[in-house]
């Protein structure tokens, strides 16, 4: 039965909102309009650390063996550093959410991707692309974008990653807040994708901002 459920889940996108009290705490700090910039950025970083931990559960490549402890021989498991894991923060707000990625996943490579959104048309435009021409075979990729609102930015990012040889099932998305328009687009276009969110909000306004959301994550993270 477990194998059957796993096969079924591979055909559809899954969204996870981990019920951890610290995740709820940091989301609440981010929501508060009175939270000053340094504390906002720290809260975003701490939220990213927790979501990165959850997203990497049962997903990282493992090697097993035996080692000699001071008291005897022990069976052990290590994360296999030979299997590539990549972090792709979407600039600029993704930098704060991905800040502690290396403390959770020390053997990763980080590829920056800059995508801006036209304030009138809400269409994405790529202004910086540091992705490799092709990801190494078997790469696992975590895309970090704090706000999944209309979905244009995250869809553009995943399209670029897939063009470089990564399958949907090898991509995970981390966000602080997700909303229905973005999640619907991701579900329709990328079956098998997994999304990890701090919280899900009900709607997006006509300017493309999540309601109630937390405002402009980039502006509030960097004070500009």
Swiss-Prot record:
Residues recorded as binding uracil, renumbered to this chain, are: 210, 215-217
UniProt-listed Pfam families: UPRTase (PF14681)
The EC number of this protein is 2.4.2.9
> Organism's domain of life?
Eukaryota
Q: Which reaction does it catalyse?
A: UMP + diphosphate = 5-phospho-alpha-D-ribose 1-diphosphate + uracil
Q: Mind naming one GO cellular-component term on file for this protein? A: cytoplasm
Reply yes or no: does the keyword Glycosyltransferase apply.
Answer: yes
Q: Which pathway features in its UniProt record? A: Pyrimidine metabolism; UMP biosynthesis via salvage pathway; UMP from uracil: step 1/1
Q: Which GO terms describe its molecular function?
A: GTP binding; uracil phosphoribosyltransferase activity
For 5-phospho-alpha-D-ribose 1-diphosphate, which residues are the binding ones?
A: 92, 117, 145-153, 216
Q: Which InterPro entries match?
A: PRibTrfase_dom (IPR000836), PRTase-like (IPR029057), UPRTase/APRTase (IPR050054), Ura_phspho_trans (IPR005765)
Query: Which BP terms in the Gene Ontology apply to this protein?
Result: UMP salvage; uracil salvage
Sorted UniProt keywords: Allosteric enzyme, Glycosyltransferase, GTP-binding, Nucleotide-binding, Transferase
How and how many cofactors are bound, per the record note? Answer: Binds 1 Mg(2+) ion per subunit. The magnesium is bound as Mg-PRPP.
Which residues bind GTP per the record? 109
Cofactors (names): Mg(2+)
Respond yes or no to whether keyword Nucleotide-binding is given for this record.
yes
* Activity regulation description: Allosterically activated by GTP.
The family database entries (NCBIfam families) matched by this protein are listed as: PRK00129.1, upp
Role played: Catalyzes the conversion of uracil and 5-phospho-alpha-D-ribose 1-diphosphate (PRPP) to UMP and diphosphate.
Family of the protein in this entry: Belongs to the UPRTase family.
Q: From the Swiss-Prot or TrEMBL record, give the protein name.
A: Uracil phosphoribosyltransferase
């Amino acid at each position: 039965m477990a194998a059957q459920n796993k096969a079924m889940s591979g055909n559809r996108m899954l969204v996870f909102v981990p019920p951890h009290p610290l995740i709820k705490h940091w989301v609440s700090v981010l929501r508060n309009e009175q939270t000053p910039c340094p504390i906002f950025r720290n809260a975003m970083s701490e939220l990213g650390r927790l979501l990165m931990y959850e997203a990497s559960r049962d997903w990282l490549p493992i090697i097993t063996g035996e080692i000699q402890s001071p008291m005897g021989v022990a069976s052990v498991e290590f994360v296999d550093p030979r299997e590539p894991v990549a972090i792709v923060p979407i600039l600029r707000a993704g930098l704060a959410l991905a800040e502690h990625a290396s403390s959770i996943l020390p053997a990763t490579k980080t590829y920056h991707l800059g995508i801006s959104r036209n304030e009138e048309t809400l269409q994405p435009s790529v202004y910086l692309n540091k992705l490799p021409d092709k990801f190494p075979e078997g790469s696992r990729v975590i895309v970090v974008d704090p706000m999944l609102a209309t979905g244009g930015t995250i869809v553009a990012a995943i399209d670029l990653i897939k063009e470089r040889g990564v399958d949907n099932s090898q991509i995970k998305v981390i966000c602080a807040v997700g909303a229905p328009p973005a999640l619907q687009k991701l579900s329709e276009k990328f079956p098998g994708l997994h999304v990890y969110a701090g919280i899900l909000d009900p709607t997006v306004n006509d300017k493309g901002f999540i309601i109630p959301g937390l405002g402009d994550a980039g502006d509030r993270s960097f004070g500009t």
